[in-house]
Amino acid sequence: MTVLSVSYSLAHVSRRTAGGAEQVLATLDEALVRAGHRSLVLAPAGSRCEGLLIPAQVPTGILDDEAKCEARRAFKKLLDRALNDYTVDIVHMHGLDFIHYMPQCDLPIVVSLHLPLSWYDLEALRRVQSNETLVCVSDAQAQTAPRDLRVDAVITNGVDLSRFHPRQNKSNYVLAISRICAEKGVHLAIDAAERAGVELIIAGSVFGYSEHLDYFESMIRPRLNEHIHFVGLVGGGHKANLMSGARCLLAPCLAPETSSLVAMEALASGTPVIAFPNGALSEIVIPGQTGFLVNRSEEMADAIREVDSLSPTACRHEAEARFSSERMFGEYMDLYRSLLASQNVALLAAA
């Protein structure tokens, strides 16, 4: 089987990136190659994948409307060329802006909706063709779909459990890992840590959108000190060590989370999650067992004081039961095979 995966037009794909959609794409790409399939990945130049990268030259720096349009044009041109140059069985779209470069073809097209449905062009989603399959990444996300929007499947994201290892003896810091932007509520994590009197390590990327840059400069940088640290993007062993050593992960997200890979990674590391109950976070965290769900930074501070009562082993067991990348890959493979079988039946009927 040959799968052509298409990223968001302005986000690099790798296992180290801050974006959940890009991490999922990278995980599926690696699993496809490991299973003996052919994986093609259309993504911005500089992305890292196990399959064949089809690199798009897209703008860097300030990501304004002009940059978005330029990136989409580049993706559209490369995607059309790739479908002409390669024999592809499945096209899998991952980007928020996929509608701007959706290929006009008869191949099965899977669209994973990684972000809140309200962020997409809903009218365009309502006009999906019969060969296009819309996938939500959590039940919480699917439940937000308007009645007239067809959601074809729900496949919960997963993480590579082998990269994370629990520690029974935790260090004395709490952790926040996310994109550094207002909807992730990083400033509220700082509020909670200061109120609880604990050290906070903040990790993640500040993307080149003006509102993200302004948020970091006005709301985060002025509050950094010997107790509040910003370490930037982390990955690999550094990320795994930070995760396993933390007393807990703070996730005060203000937007409805469609998924949360970082919360799944924390549980895989034996680290409880204290989160606002927005979207899928309320599905991931089991209050009193693998973390706490709170509504304000003051409650988050109180929960930090109680988090040492939770079992790292229970957190790990929950990750193993529900959030493995193997389970996610298996469900996508089942979907791919089902779509190809349906296509073959339709071709035979038309013959």
Regions found by a protein language model. Give the residues of each.
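Catalytic cores of nucleotide-sugar-dependent glycosyltransferases that transfer UDP/GDP/TDP-activated
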Residues: M1-A351
